[in-house]
C-alpha cells in the first residue's frame, strides 16, 4: 500500500502546489484573513470534509491565558476560523492545526516578485506566507488527497479534524478561542508549521510590548543639549539586550545548544516625531522579548518592567520612567517530551518514508503548540516543510519538502486511523 501511497502523492502534487498559489494570492495579514479562509474551505470541501465556520469576536478575549487583542483599526468584521472534519459522529481522534494569518510584506519594492503573487523559482515557491505557514495547508491537503485514493475508508470509524486559525502571529488567541469557546480539541495535535522536516517540540516564552519614552522637545539647533526621545528609546533597547544576555547566563534553555540565542530582543517598529527639525517629545518602541521557559507570563512581565525601569533610573537623561504597555503575545515557553508517543510515532512515520530520523529541537520563538500543551495538557508537535526567509524579503518554501512532509504525514495518519493499528 505504501508504494501506492507515494504514487498517489506524486499524482496530486501539482494540485497541492496550485492550492498553495491560491492561498498566497489571498493576502491574509492579521485582521483580514477571510478571503484565504474561503479558499481553504473550497479545497477541503473537495476532499469530502465537513466544514464548520467558527465565529471569531474582535472583542478582547477575557481569559488570563490570552494575549492582547490587536488594535481595532486592523480588524475587519465577520472574521471566522474553520474546522474541516471527516464525516461522522463522536470526538476527533487527531487534530491538524495551521494558521492562516501572515505577517505584513514590508517594502514590497525590495521583493524579486510581488509578495502576494506566488512565483516558482529554483524549486521553491516565493510569496508572503508560502512558508509560514500556508505551505502547511498544502501538506495536509496533499496527504489527505492521496489517502482518499489508497484508503478511502480510513476515517470511517475515527474522525480527523483540520483546523485553520487566525492570530497565531500576534497572540495565539485563535487557537485558544477554538478550544475555550468552541471545544475544538483532540487527544493529539500536529501543527504543520515549517520545521525543515524536523520535529519542533518546544519554544521559549515571548512577550510583545510598547515602550513609550518622553523627553524634552525643541528646535534642532538645541539638539546637542539633551537626548531626544528616540535616543533614549534606543538606550532602553540596548539595555534590554544586555539584560537578555544576563538572563541567559542565569537561566539557559536546557533543550537548546549552548551557542544558541533563545531570548532575543527584537525592535520591530518605532513611531516618533512630526518634523525633521524638531526634537521629538515622545517615541514608542514596539519590542518583542524572549524569556525563559520556566517563567510565567506574569512573572516575565514583572521582570521586563523591572529591567526597563532599572535602565531608565540609572540614566540621568531620562526625565521619567518609560510607560510599558503589553500589545500581543503573553506566551509562556513550552516543551513536549521528545520521547512522547506523539513524537516517537511521527518520527517512525518519517523514518519509514525517508530512511532517516527527524531532528527534534526547540526554537527561540513560539507556536500555538504551547496552548495545547500548557493550558490543556494535550500533546502537540510541529512538523512541516523547509522554509527560507520567514517574515522577510523573498520568503519561500522548498516545494519538494511539501511532498516529503506529506509522505510523512500520510504514513502517520495510517498509523493512527487504520483499524488494526498498523504502523507505517
Model regions and ranges:
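Glycine/charged-rich beta-loop-alpha catalytic/anionic-binding loops adjacent to active sites
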Residues: 115-129, 214-215, 355, 387
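Short, conserved micro-motifs enriched in small and acidic residues
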Residues: 31, 123-138, 169, 224-231, ...
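Acidic-glycine-rich active-site phosphate/pyrophosphate-binding loop
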Residues: 105-120, 201-212, 381
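Short beta-strand segments
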Residues: 97-98, 164-165, 190-193, 212-214, ...
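Acidic/histidine-rich catalytic neighborhood of metal-dependent amide-processing enzymes
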Residues: 125, 131-208, 417, 421-424
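Acidic/His- and Gly-rich active-site-bordering loop/insert found
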Residues: 2-125, 153-156
